[in-house]
Amino acid sequence: MSMPATSTKTTKLATSLIDEYALLGWRAMLTEVNLSPKPGLVDRINCGAHKDMALEDFHRSALAIQGWLPRFIEFGACSAEMAPEAVLNGLRPIGMACEGDMFRATAGVNTHKGSIFSLGLLCAAIGRLLQLNQPVTPTTVCSTAASFCRGLTDRELRTNNARLTAGQRLYQQLGLTGARGEAEAGYPLVINHALPHYLTLLDQGLDPELALLDTLLLLMATNGDTNVASRGGEGGLRWLQREAQTLLQKGGIRTPADLDYLRQFDRECIERNLSPGGSADLLILTWFLAQI
């Protein structure tokens, strides 16, 4: 992907700045997948509750997606004068092209579809804020992303069509809004819970990997994860939330010895075929936002 040396034709953003944020997005995806052990998720130890994907698929996928993150930022900047509700339609073709490269990189395996949506939104929000000379903070980025998604849940989940998507079915049956609802609300699970929790643990001197694992537990305990519900129904989701909450109440992940609890949790998730992929996507955003 070729870009001008200093700025794009239609924006005033320096290529170096665009690439800096794109690199953070790539690092966020790698940080999440390499984090181990993660209950039910692909990591350096095993493939979790997945039989169709491995660690290397995620590495290839993240690299393919990194090449598209500057496009999201650029579009966010180019569309800065548009009404925010109009931005999402312009982002969709970029997201679909990015998704195509992901599938080509992984031979058809869906590794990061959720992250394309969420990181794409945040990158576009960053581009818009930079173009408008507004502060780029976790709060402003998430509120800007939310403005792009206004009405999204109504449009895409509240439908009476005979052929429901998995997301529409989970919304009708359990009231779960998934990635769309979290985005439209401005990522409250990240902004109000995961990010301050993670930053507090780092400020206390906790090892960054342990802090991130503990933050993953917090997300698993609070997130209405549609990935989990689609595999295990409401019962599977409630079980996973209870188990994560129990570990947090016992003190969470504070020492390497606590990793044994996560390994046992991982084994139980694999037995139940549960994978908290939605929480993993939110963890990617948490790490990403912690860097800006």
From Swiss-Prot:
Q: Which reaction does it catalyse?
A: 3'-dephospho-CoA + ATP = 2'-(5''-triphospho-alpha-D-ribosyl)-3'-dephospho-CoA + adenine
Indicate the enzyme's highest-level EC class.
transferase
Give the EC number: 2.4.2.52
* Keyword Heme annotated: no
At the top level, the lineage of the source is Bacteria
List this protein's GO terms for biological process.
prosthetic group biosynthetic process
Q: Which Pfam families match?
A: CitG
Q: Give the Gene Ontology MF terms in alphabetical order.
A: ATP binding; triphosphoribosyl-dephospho-CoA synthase activity
- UniProt cross-references to InterPro entries, sorted A to Z: CitG, TriPribosyl-deP-CoA_syn_CitG
Task: Enumerate the UniProt keywords alphabetically.
Answer: ATP-binding, Nucleotide-binding, Transferase
Q: Which PANTHER family match?
A: 2-(5''-TRIPHOSPHORIBOSYL)-3'-DEPHOSPHOCOENZYME-A SYNTHASE (PTHR30201:SF2), TRIPHOSPHORIBOSYL-DEPHOSPHO-COA SYNTHASE (PTHR30201)
Q: What is the role of the protein in this entry?
A: Catalyzes the formation of 2-(5''-triphosphoribosyl)-3'-dephosphocoenzyme-A, the precursor of the prosthetic group of the holo-acyl carrier protein (gamma chain) of citrate lyase, from ATP and dephospho-CoA.
Q: Which family does it belong to?
A: Belongs to the CitG/MdcB family.
Q: What is this protein called?
A: 2-(5''-triphosphoribosyl)-3'-dephosphocoenzyme-A synthase
Q: Origin organism of this chain?
A: Escherichia coli O6:K15:H31 (strain 536 / UPEC)
Report the gene name. Answer: citG
